[in-house]
């Protein structure tokens, strides 16, 4: 299988439902260190753990911006899914987090 995210210019981190990191692209490893096979909960406070639990239990997404080391970033966390074992549809399999550096000012377009 192709690793489409290996060299993209944003950090891509994926965990399973036990919050164990199952994938990091090159950018994620460079920013966060190699966390593959480790539980990510130790890196998060109680508030963040609550958000993680909600994403996993309700299948909702979470987005916000941060400033870190002089860069603004958009963080988007969204569930990923797998087919349900009983064939009834799909079930949350974990979380994908995208961390994208964004400029201080950027255009916004209304396409509606």
Positions of PLM-derived features:
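Sensory/regulatory domains in signal-transduction proteins
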Residues: 23, 27-111
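Sensory modules in modular signal-transduction proteins
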Residues: 1-24
């Amino acid at each position: 299988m192709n690793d489409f995210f290996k060299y993209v210019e944003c950090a891509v981190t994926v965990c399973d439902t036990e919050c164990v990191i199952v994938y990091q692209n090159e950018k994620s490893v460079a920013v966060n260190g190699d966390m593959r096979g480790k539980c990510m909960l130790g890196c998060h406070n109680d508030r963040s753990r609550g958000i993680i639990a909600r994403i996993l239990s309700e299948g909702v997404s979470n987005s916000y911006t941060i400033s870190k080391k002089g860069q603004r970033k958009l963080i988007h966390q969204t569930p990923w899914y797998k087919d349900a074992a009983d064939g009834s549809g799909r079930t949350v399999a974990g979380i994908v987090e995208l961390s994208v550096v964004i400029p201080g000012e950027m255009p916004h377009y209304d396409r509606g």
